[in-house]
Structures are given as structure tokens and as C-alpha cells.
Amino acid sequence: MGIVLRQSFKNVVATYLGFAIGALNTLFLFTYFLSKAQYGLVSYVTSTATILSPLIAFGVSNTWVRYYSAYTDRQEQGKLNLMLCLLPLLVILPATLLGSMAYEQITQWLSAKNAEVRPYVWLIFLTAVAMAYFEIAYAWMRVQLKTVFGNFLKEVFHRVGMMLLLVAVYFDVIDFHQLMWGVFWVYALRMFLMFISAFYVRRPTFAWGLPQGKKEVFLYSLFVILSGSVASVLMDIDKFMLNQYLPISEIAVYNVAIFTATVIAIPYRSMYQIVSPLTAQFMNQQKPQELANLYKRSTVNTYFVSMVICVLIVVNAQQCYALLPDKDYSTGLWVLIIISVVKLSDALVGFSNAVLLNSPYYRTVLFLGVFLVIGAVLMNRWLIPLYGINGAGVATLIAFSSYNLLKSVFVYRKYGLQPFYKETLQTTLFGLLAIGCFFFWDFPFHPLVNIGLKSLLVAGMSVFFLLKYKVSEELVRLISKFRN
């Protein structure tokens, strides 16, 4: 657990730095320097690229994590590396050809409700390619158990780049069109830096030919396309579909709420980067006891930290909206609360995903994910016209809750692993009590002062609860070291 905690802590620091910069961008620079329509357009392009990137990556990032430790022969590893580097071309080349042939039809469909999208359709595809190859290089770092710099690039680099672009727009160094292309170049530079780092840490060997078990590797990659797409589609399909039904400015309101709630997932995302390859190792080496211990401790630690963050966000939400220049952004309050529940459920059951993707049962779960994506699309089509952005939030909640519940049931039936321990129940009760105590009132001061005072009270309550009930041995030891 030592390497998990060390790298997870560093990843959490880098991720929170990224989200701090992202918060500055999302809550202030975007809202002050761009119109809501411009902000919505940036969000739409990046969200659609995020949906496409797992398809373009052809599942390679997860496949590398799943199979790298299973190949011990250097020659076979070289063949595996070559195969996985070339697989994305099976999507990129046909997609480029199809996009060239059907460009007019695609642009008409995407810009039917909002004509502003039309000039940036190709930009969506190029950004998706840069995102996909970044994840492939990052997967190589993860199988070497070196996740910190990659996580820094993943969470911090592009947000710093976006901040610089927004400042450049504000001072009229570039115009909005140049900013849109600048977004692509930020992601492209991030991809190149990731490849340089990956080769520096350990240069991959390549050997001509296909590895043993090539059919299994190929089929796993094929199915993981669906898995990666499921997570991306479930999280970003709402923004994509909002463009089809509502003014693009509504995406800006929705994005502020989504980004704020996403902070809850930081501990899970950071720990997952190192837990996933360790899970693959324990499963390949058939060490069920070590796997069960890793699963429980990771779940308990992550869920408690995520719950504290969730409480802080929900009880301070109204004061945060009071700081924004356009009061229309506050219409996203219920979206923020709904998506906070989604992110909290991810923190609770998310490590089941690492078990499933590294198990022989991944096909069943991926097919399940496809049906859930279809359900999410249908629910968004039904709820967005009726309830606007709140309908999109409810559709996301239903889809993710169903997906997480079914994954947890499957893991429990096959491996006897489940996230519902005494510690997670205690943490849930703590979260409900804290929100009940602090959500319905505010101090009569400036919003920043109110946020600071409430946060101090919540932090004190959290530390008291942790020390009294000892829901996490690692966190208790960490606090004890800090006190000493």
C-alpha cells in the first residue's frame, strides 16, 4: 500500500493544483472574458472530443495496463508494444476518410441548432486524436508504476495553457477563433510531452510481428473501446445533446456546475492511476487476498476524502454562485447537487471498474455499458426538452447510478468484493448529517468570508469524526504525524 499512498498523494496534489487553476478558469476567466455563447462553444468542442477519444484510442490504454505484466518475454513484449501503438490507426484512417467524404452532412447535423459550431468540426476530431495518443503514452507510464508526471500533464498542463489563452484574448493578443485553435495546440503539446516523458522513463522495445494471444488482446481492445466510450459518453453526452436542443449558452451554465462537482472525483481519479495496474498484477498473479485488501483500503480512503469534498461543495454552492458576474449561472445549482451525487457514487464503487477491466468477465460488463449508453441517450432526449439542464443532470444521475450498481453486483458475485463496509456506511451518515447542518443557512458576510467560515467548521467536524470513529487507519496516521 506504500507505493499507492505515495503516488496517490502526489497525484492528489497535482490534481488539486489542476482543479484550482481550472476553477479560476471556469468560475472567473471564462465567465468574465468570454460571452456565455463563446464559453459554451469551447465546452462543446472539448466535450465532443472527449467522447471521441476512447474510440480513436482503440482501447489501447486499458489493454496495456491489462496485458503488459502478463508478457514476461522481451520479444513478446516488443510485439505487444508495436501492436498496441498501431491499433488506433484502424480508427483514425477510416474516420479521416469518412469525415472528408461526408464533411458537409456532419457539419449540418452538428450545427443545426447552433451555427457557431460549424467552423470547428474538424477541430473536434484533431483534438480527440491528441487526447487519445496522450492516454496511450500515459498508459505506458502507468504500467511502469510512474504516474506522477503523467497525472500532472493530465490535470494541470492543459488548464495552464487554457488560462494563458484566455488572458491573451482579454488583452487582444489573439481573437476568439485563434483561441479555439489554441485549445487544440495545447492538447497536442501535452501529447508530445507525454511521449517524451514515456520514452525517458523506459524506452519501449518494438519487435516485428504479433504477440502470442494476439486474438485475445485484439478482442479486449475492441471491447475496451466500448468501455472507455461508455464512461466518456455517459459523462459528456449531456453537453453534446444540450447543443441539439438548447442555446449553446446553456452549456456554459451546465459546465460550471459539472466542473465544480467534478472536484469530488479527484481522490478517486488520482488513486485509480496506481490502483489499476496493481489490480492487474494481483489478478495475473492470482493473489485474491492482496486484491481484497487493496480494494477495501482504497475504497474506504477515497470515499471518506470525496465525501468531505462533497460536503464542502454542496454547503458552499450558493455562496460560490454569488461570486459569478452573471447570476444566470446560479440556475445550475440543482445540476451541481445532482452531479455531486454521481461523483460520490463513482468514489464509492469506482474501483470495481479496475477489477472488471482486468478480469475475464470484461465482455459482459462492456455489453452492459452499451445498453446503458443507449438508455442515457434516450433519457436525455426525453428530459432535456422538458427540464433543460436539470433534465440532463437527472439523466446522468440515473445512467451512472444504474451503471455503478450493476458493476458492483457483478464484482460481488464473481469475486466477493463490495464497497459497502461499516466504514463507508459511517462516512455516508456523516455526510448527510454535515449537509443537513450547514446547507440551509449562511453567515451574513461577504460570500468569500462565508465560504471560509463554513469550510473551517466542516473541516473541524470531519477531523473529529475521523479521529473518533477511525474510518481510515491511513488517514488517522497521517493526521497523527502532522500533529506531531
Placement of each model-derived feature along the sequence:
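Interhelical loop/hinge segments that connect adjacent transmembrane helices in multipass membrane
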Residues: M1-V4, E116, D172, F176-V183, ...
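Signature of the first transmembrane helix
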Residues: I3-N62, I92-S100, T127, L219-I248, ...
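Membrane-interface junctions at transmembrane-helix termini in multi-pass inner-membrane proteins
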Residues: L5, A130-L153, S340-F371, V411-R413
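Helix-loop junctions and terminal segments of transmembrane helices
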Residues: A57-T72, V143, A257, A261-T299, ...
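Interfacial segments at transmembrane-helix termini and the short loops linking adjacent helices
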Residues: Y103-I124, I313-K343, G350
